[in-house]
Amino acid sequence: MPNSITTGLPLLDRLLYQKGWAKREMVLFMGFAKSGKSTAMGEFSINATLAGYNVLYLSLEVHTTILSDRFDARLSETEMSKLVERRDEVHRKLAELGATKGIGSLWVVERPSGSMSPADLDRMLNSMKANGMVPDMVVVDYADLMRASYDLRDDRANIRSIYTDLRALYDKHNVAGITASQTNREGGASEVATMMHAADNIEKVRIADLVITINKTEEEEAKGEARLYFAGSRNQQGGISIRVKQNLEQMRFIERILDVT
């Protein structure tokens, strides 16, 4: 029996070793600036919640008010630019969803960049559990903006420590873990970013159980398309490329899967 959380996309679930985001493991999305990393993590958090799972979303970059608007846009399938003028319709759709049985909880916590360590997150999870709030998935947006639990006085060593401790935390609390990191300039210019394009420290991609890069040419971006590339995996075949249709105005990272190669 797979020990995983659905992605919300049956085809993507089938491509994953545990038929979803595996518990006790870390998935790392990598992409250049503004490639949609936060949108991806938001979408998969919502999909898990709609499937009945509880999700903790820790934001170290985007304010909760903006995240709330993004989640409202995604859930109501409304363009971000039209949330205000269509607020009555949005509220109606959200109320209908809220009345649906079997929906999980999505807890969103905002902290300043550099203020939260894996040890702090561990204490937060312990406190949540003591109050009956038990997440199935923990999303960190994103790990590069955490601080090390113990300052090693070396940036590369601190990054390695953050990812090692975060991966251990996902294991300890039996949750599916998702985070993201930025590719370097070369990765942003490449048609397909690989593990070698990790910014700051390649050790982070060695620690992650699954590394998925977000890729799009200018032509693909104009068509609302992107490619997800399985750049590295501990438990399954790598090198898989998934071409997807997006609707980023509605915060839909994957509207549908176009093909898999």
Model-identified regions with their sequence ranges:
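N-terminal pre-Walker A segment at the start of P-loop NTPase domains
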Residues: M1-L15
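Cytosolic-facing regulatory segments adjacent to core modules
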Residues: D13-Y17, L50-V134, A148, S241-V244
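Phosphate-binding P-loop
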Residues: Y17-R24
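Walker A (P-loop) phosphate-binding loop of P-loop NTPases
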Residues: K34
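Conserved lysine of the Walker
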Residues: K37
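Hydrophobic positions on the alpha1 helix immediately C-terminal to the Walker A/P-loop
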Residues: A40, F44
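C-terminal regions of RecA-like/P-loop NTPase motor modules
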Residues: T78, A99-K101, P118-V138, D171-H173, ...
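Phosphate-binding/switch loop-helix module in NTP-utilizing enzymes
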Residues: W107-K172, R234
